[in-house]
Amino acid sequence: KIFLIEFQKTSIDEPHIQELTPEIINSFSQKKEHTILLDRIGNANNLGAIVRSAAFFGIKNIVIPKDESQTSITTSSYRVAEGGMEFVQIYSTSSVLSLLKSVKGKMVRIGTDLNASKNVSVIHDLCTKKPALIILGNEENGISESVRANCDELVIIPFFGMKKGKASPVESLNVAQAATVILYELQKGNQAF
């Protein structure tokens, strides 16, 4: 027997990526909206998974740099987001450093770093008066040195049994997995139950 399988071509409209303006940046802090900044995330599936986690945890804003090392929204990232693209606005910026400088004092700029001394569990307490700008770095290199230098706080997700001088069985979590842990810690004090 021969079975014929017909594949239906489906097209997904690319979500509008809005250019970040000073007015939009000010609205993040005025509305006390936590925001995610991606620093050169190269994998479209990771972008989609981060969008899905952001939507799940009520984060409405994600900023991506206009940089060729930063992935944009693809059909793959849209599918991985599983509906999250409808709840999250993606913005683009031509300068990550300008964004970090413009939110100084208005938002808590929190970077992720394998050498950080603060546990991610403190993240909610860091953001009781100002919203967070969570910075997630490239899959291989993390956040850049210039971004790290412009963070108010650096946090680490500790591995099981973490002790000074003890190596992790794996270097780190995937950036999308790390985003989920960070957003959970950020929002855990805001649960309605």
Residue ranges of predicted features:
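RNA substrate-binding interface of SAM-dependent RNA methyltransferases
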Residues: F3-S117
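Surface-exposed amphipathic alpha-helices with a cationic face
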Residues: L100-K104, H124-C127, Q187
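Acidic active-site catalytic centers that drive phospho-/nucleotidyl reactions
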Residues: D39, N46, E139, D152, ...
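Structured adenosyl-cofactor binding patch, chiefly the S-adenosyl-L-methionine
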Residues: S76-G84, E145-F193
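Active-site/ligand-binding-proximal alpha/beta "capping" segment
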Residues: R109-E171
